[in-house]
């Protein structure tokens, strides 16, 4: 494993080679000065020890090198991790920086948007404050103008209000303050009524009155909320349009805290805006007054009863209560559409000497009124809530209609009320107010009708669009349904067509199969006849062929029998010739050459003839004769080429050996001693094929006489016997030995022991 590990780094093989080339000889050369022998001659144990030490050293080197490589690799990995960590931290810092910059930009954008919004709000507030300031200035200017217009009568007022400052309201304020009970609710109501009177005086008495200064005195100290002079009475409801601005509540809050400016502030601007402010205030009063059934408690204080022939105002709490509920008098807080109801509260002209009586009557009425305050205790809270909100338009219209009817009734009764001294003037004022209310109502009704018509048209348009959308959706749904039905019908038709085609195809296939079956049934007898005829022909051909083969085999057997007989005769002749040559060595060489020629030629001819006639494979009594002949034929040329036997002699392989044996058996008469010493044994086919190597003929060299060869024939026979080995059957005595026995032994060597040898008869 260590060697493999070192090889993994590519360094183990190199030190090992160098150590084998250089280190080992050096270690051996250290003990002696000169190396006298080769390294191969060192002791075996020493060499193994050196090899193990070298292997350990190399393994140690490989381990060290591997550890170094691992350490270097770990160092590289650590450095790579450190670089990756630094890069990651850098990327995170960059990302956080970008996120922080983006957040700062968003904060800046948000701050800029917020600053713009605040700037717009500040501008809007400044615009509203400026508008409120201008409205307040106009209101203050109107108040100053009113106070200056009422300045002379206030200086010598009969009610004992001499020496009041500019900011003090008209005499009704004093009266209300002196007659109210000390409880907090009543005080608040009285204060509101006082402010209402102040604002009403501001809005109605801004213009100077050239006539009747005593009348002005009486009106300033009376409880009448609004009075009209004969010349200025129709000036109030000139403009039917009224302004619904948010300045009313602010004026109510700031009116008491603002002080009047000097006389220099009253100029052309105050005079120019006087009439516009008057019209606006009056119309606002007409709009909102009807929504408050009970406004303040100051209205009964302003009703005075006069003694003598002057008609007195009724001081009944019930009457005053109904009057306050039906006709509120505070134009600042409630702004009634028909302030004062001049028809109902009209009073005759009062003289200056009746003022003390009026005060006494007021004190009496205040005492009587204290009993009614308990019943109206829940009133201030509802009044305060109603004073701070703008009432709905439709409620104002209904209440306006109701007050109009009451005004007509009061006019029919002919009760004198304060505010004007002329009944015709009051009728004109009432008619003008009714006309304005009717015009306003008609205008509102027209606007309502237009709005309703517009709403109706919008609803109809929406309904028409919805109907069109519904129709469109229905049409689309109908088209989709028709398309779906059409697709289903097409699909159904296609399926039916496919089914019909499949049925036709199946029917056609069934018909074709039926026709084919019928055709096959018709052709079946003919095929059977043809097959029978063919079988018969084949049988006849086979029989003819068998007869031919049998005939051929018979002829071949006959030829083979003739060939065997001829070969036997030829062998016998050759053996005789060989035996003669061995006995008679004094025969001339010429005669010896001619005799083998004459003995061999017939055998060669017979072999050639047999070769042409005998087939490739023919079996006679278990012997493959064709193979034997062919084997003998092929073995002879391989062993004895033509250049050796140029004298015309051809060796016949095992035939020569058999002839020699036969010759010896036939020559028993001449040399019985040699024959008796020979043991003839059956040999196998392979031994017969190899016998020519030891035959006596192989010892004969062409062109050399037999006497020069010496006694080679006897030696050849001895060698042959040694090669073939001892006999495998018991020896026969010389008395029983005959030619027939020898032939029989030879034939049995070629055949198997269990087969009969029909060739024995020929021997």
UniProtKB/Swiss-Prot annotation:
What start-end ranges are recorded for coiled-coil regions in this protein? 54-147
Stretches with biased composition (Basic and acidic residues): 52-63, 355-371, 385-400, 430-540
Question: What's the protein here called?
Answer: MAP7 domain-containing protein 2
Residue spans of biased composition, Gly residues class: 1-11
Annotated Pfam families: MAP7
Record's family? Belongs to the MAP7 family.
Regions of compositional bias (Polar residues) in chain numbering: 192-206
PANTHER family listed in its UniProt record: MAP7 DOMAIN-CONTAINING PROTEIN 2, MICROTUBULE-ASSOCIATED PROTEIN
Describe its function: Microtubule-stabilizing protein involved in the control of cell motility and neurite outgrowth. Acts as a critical cofactor for kinesin transport; in the proximal axon regulates kinesin-1 family members, KIF5A, KIF5B and KIF5C recruitment to microtubules and contributes to kinesin-1-mediated transport in the axons.
| Biological processes, Gene Ontology terms | axon development; microtubule cytoskeleton organization
Self-association state and partner proteins as the record states: Interacts (via N-terminus) with microtubules; facilitates microtubule stabilization. Interacts with kinesin-1 family members, KIF5A, KIF5B and KIF5C.
Q: What is its main location?
A: cytoplasm
Keywords, ordered alphabetically: Cell projection, Coiled coil, Cytoplasm, Cytoskeleton
GO CC entries: axon; centrosome; microtubule; midbody; neuron projection
* Location within or outside the cell: Cytoplasm, Cytoskeleton, Microtubule organizing center, Centrosome; Midbody; Cytoplasm, Cytoskeleton; Cell projection, Neuron projection
Organism of this sequence: Pongo abelii
Molecular function via GO: kinesin binding; microtubule binding
Q: Which domain of life is it from?
A: Eukaryota
């Amino acid at each position: 494993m260590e060697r493999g590990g070192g090889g993994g780094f590519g360094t183990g093989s190199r030190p090992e080679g160098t150590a084998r080339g250089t280190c080992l000889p050096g270690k051996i050369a250290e003990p002696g000065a000169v190396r006298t022998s080769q390294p191969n001659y060192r002791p075996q144990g020493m060499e193994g020890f050196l090899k193990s030490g070298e292997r350990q050293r190399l393994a140690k080197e490989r381990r060290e090198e591997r550890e170094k490589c691992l350490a270097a690799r770990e160092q590289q990995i650590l450095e790579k991790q450190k670089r990756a960590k630094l890069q990651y931290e850098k990327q995170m810092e960059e990302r956080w920086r970008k996120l922080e910059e983006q957040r700062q930009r968003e904060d800046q954008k948000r701050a800029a948007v917020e600053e713009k919004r605040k700037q717009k709000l500040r501008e809007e507030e400044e615009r509203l404050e400026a508008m409120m300031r201008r409205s307040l200035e106009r209101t203050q200017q109107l108040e100053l103008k009113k106070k200056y217009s009422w300045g002379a009568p206030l200086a010598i007022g009969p009610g004992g209000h001499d020496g009041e400052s500019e900011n003090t309201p008209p005499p009704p304020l004093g009266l209300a303050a002196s007659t109210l009970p000390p409880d907090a609710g009543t005080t608040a109501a009285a204060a509101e009524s006082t402010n209402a009177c102040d604002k009403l005086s501001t809005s109605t008495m801004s213009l100077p009155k050239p006539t009747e200064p005593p009348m002005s005195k009486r009106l300033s100290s009376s409880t009448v909320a609004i009075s009209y002079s004969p010349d200025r009475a129709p000036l109030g409801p000139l403009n039917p349009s009224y302004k619904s601005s948010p300045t009313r509540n602010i004026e109510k809050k700031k009116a008491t805290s603002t002080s009047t400016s000097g006389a220099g502030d009253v100029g052309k601007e105050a005079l120019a805006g006087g009439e516009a402010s008057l019209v606006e205030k009056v119309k606002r009063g007409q709009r909102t007054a009807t929504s408050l059934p009970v406004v303040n408690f100051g209205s009964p204080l302003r009703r005075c009863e006069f003694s003598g022939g002057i008609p007195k105002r009724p001081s009944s709490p019930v009457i005053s209560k109904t009057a306050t509920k039906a006709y509120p008098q505070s134009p600042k807080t409630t702004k009634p559409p028909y302030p004062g109801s001049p028809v109902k509260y009209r009073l005759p002209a009062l003289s200056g000497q009746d003022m003390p009586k009026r005060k006494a009557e007021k004190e009496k009425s205040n005492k009587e009124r204290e009993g009614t305050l308990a019943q109206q205790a829940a009133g201030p809270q509802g009044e305060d809530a109603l004073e701070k909100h703008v009432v709905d338009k439709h409620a104002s219209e209904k209440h306006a209609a109701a007050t109009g009817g009451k005004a007509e009734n009061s006019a029919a009764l002919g009760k004198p009320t304060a505010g004007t001294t002329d009944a015709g003037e009051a009728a004109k004022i009432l008619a003008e107010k009714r006309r304005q209310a009717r015009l306003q109502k008609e205008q509102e009704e027209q606007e309502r009708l237009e709005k309703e018509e517009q709403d109706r048209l919008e609803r109809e348009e929406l309904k028409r669009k919805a109907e069109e959308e519904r129709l469109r959706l229905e049409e689309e749904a109908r088209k989709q349904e028709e398309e779906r039905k059409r697709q289903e019908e097409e699909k159904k038709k296609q399926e039916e067509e496919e089914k019909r085609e499949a049925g036709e195809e199946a029917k056609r296939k069934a018909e074709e199969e039926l026709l084919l079956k019928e055709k096959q049934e018709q052709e079946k007898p003919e095929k059977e006849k043809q097959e029978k005829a063919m079988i018969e022909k084949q049988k006849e051909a086979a029989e003819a062929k068998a007869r031919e083969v049998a005939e051929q085999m018979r002829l071949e057997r006959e030829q083979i029998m003739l060939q065997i007989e001829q070969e036997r005769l030829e062998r016998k002749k050759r053996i005789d010739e060989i035996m003669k040559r061995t006995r008679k060595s004094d025969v001339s060489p010429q005669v010896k050459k001619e005799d083998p020629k004459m003995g061999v030629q017939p055998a060669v001819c017979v072999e050639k003839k047999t070769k042409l006639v005998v087939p490739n494979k023919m079996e006679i009594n278990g012997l493959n004769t064709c193979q034997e002949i062919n084997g003998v034929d092929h073995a002879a040329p391989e062993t004895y080429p033509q250049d050796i036997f140029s004298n015309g002699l051809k060796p016949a392989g095992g035939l020569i050996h058999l002839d020699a044996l036969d010759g010896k058996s036939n020559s028993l008469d001449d040399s019985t001693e040699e024959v008796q010493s020979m043991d003839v044994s059956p040999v196998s086919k392979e031994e017969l094929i190899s016998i020519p190597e030891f035959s006596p003929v192989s010892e004969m060299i062409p062109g050399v006489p037999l006497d020069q060869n010496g006694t080679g024939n006897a030696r050849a026979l001895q060698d042959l016997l040694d090669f073939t080995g001892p006999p495998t059957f018991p020896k026969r005595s010389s008395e029983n030995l005959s030619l027939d026995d020898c032939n029989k032994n030879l034939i049995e060597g070629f055949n198997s022991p269990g087969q009969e040898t029909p060739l024995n008869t020929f021997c």
